[in-house]
Amino acid sequence: MGKYFGTDGFRGEANMNLTADHAYKVGRFLGWYYSELKKRNGIDGPARIVIGKDTRRSSYMFEYCLIGGLVASGADAYMLHVTTTPSVSYIARVDEFDCGIMISASHNPYYDNGIKLINSCGEKMDEETISYIENYLDGEVELFGEKWTEVPYAHKDKIGCTVDYVSGRNRYI
């Protein structure tokens, strides 16, 4: 377990120890990281990241912040809207997304929320990637042989797109 991410994601009381700024920065890092991995592996196109959320009031805020970070970094954000964690895992795997994000605090009180990260296989994100995110949230991450205090923004036609992907959710539910 890290400073922010516990056994099942980054959880906390909305706008107290889990803020809109945290969500934006998680989106910024993931959008850049997966776009950079694709580029370094000779794969064309933007990173593709799928997002779902539960019905908590703060889930909408966190969704918009995550999406803002993702597209600012050049990733395409696919929105499943209100859905379940298993549906995000399923769609991340079968539709070959770079990763998935679920905004939910499961059984915790309504004022809490969380950001769960899912890899391309539909499983919990690996600890190494989570440690990169935590280091970025703390102000500096060492990755690809460099130290990053801020990751680059995408420009012009490299800015990511948002995609309404309710059809993906409907295939699962």
Can you annotate each of these PLM segments?
Residues 32-33, 77-80, 106, 127-132, ...:
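Short, surface-exposed, polar/charged, turn-prone segments marking secondary-structure boundaries
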Residues 20-25, 66-68, 95, 118, ...:
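Hydrophobic alpha-helical segments
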Residues 13, 113-173:
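Gly/Ser/Thr-enriched, mixed-charge loops and adjacent short helices
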